[in-house]
Amino acid sequence: MSEQIYGIHAVNAFLANAPERLIEVFVLKGREDKRLNPLLDELQRLSISVQQVNRQTLDNKAQGEVHQGIIARIIPQKELNEYDLNELLQHKSNPLLLILDGVTDPHNLGACLRTADAAGVDAVIVPKDKSATLTAIARKVACGAAEAMPLIRVTNLARTMRELQDKHQIWIVGTAGEATTDIYTSQLTGAIALVMGAEGDGMRRLTREHCDQLVSIPMAGSVSSLNVSVATGVCLFEIVRQKLSR
């Protein structure tokens, strides 16, 4: 069984992080692109098969998504779970985690992974149910972060949150528009897990109940909420700012 990824950034990042999982690459015949040429040279050096194909073939493989003239077939990555999370946390002091509850849009998942990687998050945690999977779309939007950022899928999110609190002493901060405390007046240092809910519905009830603290993002304009990936960036970089200013 194989998967595919597309886009120059996504394939380049995959080549840098997991070249052993690249099966073959399809590129647009006759395309001249200074960003593409170094990538093709490296693929040739590693003896990875590269096929020159026409645009219709690439369009069909990408199913209408923007592929930038390159698609790669890859071996799927092993799915990480609760046991991998515990192993990861044993080697971290003051970890920063991101929990996505009910984020089902692969574009949003990819954007959140990219933001999490930029903010130095140690792992992103999602439930197995009601969550986007790491599709080719998510990988492309993540611009390489999907290969670098551990994505942990857990069977029971509430139970995982309890274990983070009890076993690893991680403070769990949930975001909610109606929270009376905003993120800028909250103390967010130490070991932190930030929980972001789905757009519109927010966090599920049980997820909310397992948060140690709820915070909001102050909104000054006429819109009532932000896209989940934008809100994730706002919150993560406020946490980073506080950690750096300690």
UniProtKB/Swiss-Prot annotation:
S-adenosyl-L-methionine binds at residues 197, 217, 226. The keyword rRNA processing applies. Belongs to the class IV-like SAM-binding methyltransferase superfamily. RNA methyltransferase TrmH family. RlmB subfamily. Keywords: Cytoplasm, Methyltransferase, rRNA processing, S-adenosyl-L-methionine, Transferase. This is 23S rRNA (guanosine-2'-O-)-methyltransferase RlmB. InterPro entries: 23S_rRNA_MeTrfase_RlmB (IPR024915), Alpha/beta_knot_MTases (IPR029028), Ribosomal_eL30-like_sf (IPR029064), rRNA_MeTrfase_TrmH (IPR004441), SpoU_MeTrfase (IPR001537), SpoU_subst-bd (IPR013123), tRNA_m1G_MTases_N (IPR029026). SMART domains: SpoU_sub_bind. GO terms for cellular component: cytosol. The lineage of its organism: Bacteria, Pseudomonadati, Pseudomonadota, Gammaproteobacteria, Pasteurellales. The keyword Lyase does not apply. SUPFAM superfamilies: alpha/beta knot (SSF75217), L30e-like (SSF55315). It comes from Haemophilus ducreyi (strain 35000HP / ATCC 700724). One of its GO terms (molecular function) is rRNA (guanosine-2'-O-)-methyltransferase activity. Specifically methylates the ribose of guanosine 2251 in 23S rRNA. It is found in: Cytoplasm. Its main location: cytoplasm.
